């Protein structure tokens, strides 16, 4: 496990939860995750769940993605998706507003790996360098990804070679995130 990435993710999650506590006097609330089982759920309302991060309990790797392509995935991606269970978190990096994707449960982790495989299949078909997404943006065709060749974090337009460098590594990126509520 990449300790710098794990700590940066835990630190951002703490900043996010602290900001939520300060503004709402509660743990983060999600309507999107209502009805989806998770160890993160601390209480449920009529149409939403309150959640708090929990330690990841599964196998701490994305080996299914590696096996599907017979490639080695950046260690930071293994760490990013297997440090904790948590709800997705809204954040800002510079002037970019994003939703940082998280693993909600072991079932969700399997789905995330399937989506990463699908993403890599498309990139391979289009002969694009491999990236692995970590966040979504308001613009549906743009994501924040980690380049599997260099480990750098970029803003990417799906299906194209258009990429903008954001950070040299995932820990640096996570350390610069500001929570958005």
Curated annotation (Swiss-Prot):
Q: Name one GO cellular component term.
A: cytoplasmic side of plasma membrane
The protein's UniProt keywords, in alphabetical order, are: Cell inner membrane, Cell membrane, Membrane
Which domain of life does the UniProt lineage start with? Bacteria
Instruction: Write down the Gene3D superfamilies for this protein, in alphabetical order.
Output: Syd protein (3.40.1580.20)
Q: Where in the cell is it found?
A: Cell inner membrane
Task: Provide the membrane topology annotation.
Answer: Peripheral membrane protein
Transmembrane parts of this sequence: none
Q: Which family does it belong to?
A: Belongs to the Syd family.
List the HAMAP family: Syd (MF_01104)
Outline what the protein does. Interacts with the SecY protein in vivo. May bind preferentially to an uncomplexed state of SecY, thus functioning either as a chelating agent for excess SecY in the cell or as a regulatory factor that negatively controls the translocase function.
Q: What is this protein called?
A: Protein Syd
The protein's organism comes out as Escherichia coli O17:K52:H18 (strain UMN026 / ExPEC)
């Amino acid at each position: 496990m990449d300790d710098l990435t794990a700590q940066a993710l835990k630190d951002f999650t703490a900043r996010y939860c602290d900001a939520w506590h300060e503004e709402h006097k509660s743990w983060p609330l999600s309507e999107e995750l209502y009805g989806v089982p998770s160890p993160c759920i601390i209480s449920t309302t009529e149409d939403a769940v309150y959640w708090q991060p929990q330690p990841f309990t599964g196998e701490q790797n994305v080996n299914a993605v590696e096996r599907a392509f017979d490639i080695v995935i950046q260690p930071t991606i293994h760490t990013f998706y297997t440090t904790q269970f948590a709800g997705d978190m809204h954040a800002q990096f510079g002037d970019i507003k994003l939703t940082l994707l998280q693993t909600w449960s072991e079932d969700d982790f399997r789905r995330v790996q399937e989506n990463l495989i699908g993403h890599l299949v498309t990139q391979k078909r289009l002969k694009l360098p491999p990236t692995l997404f970590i966040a979504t943006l308001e613009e549906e065709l743009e994501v924040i990804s980690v380049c599997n060749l260099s480990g750098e974090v970029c803003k990417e337009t799906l299906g194209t070679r258009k990429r903008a460098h954001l950070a040299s590594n995932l820990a640096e990126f996570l350390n610069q995130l500001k929570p958005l509520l």
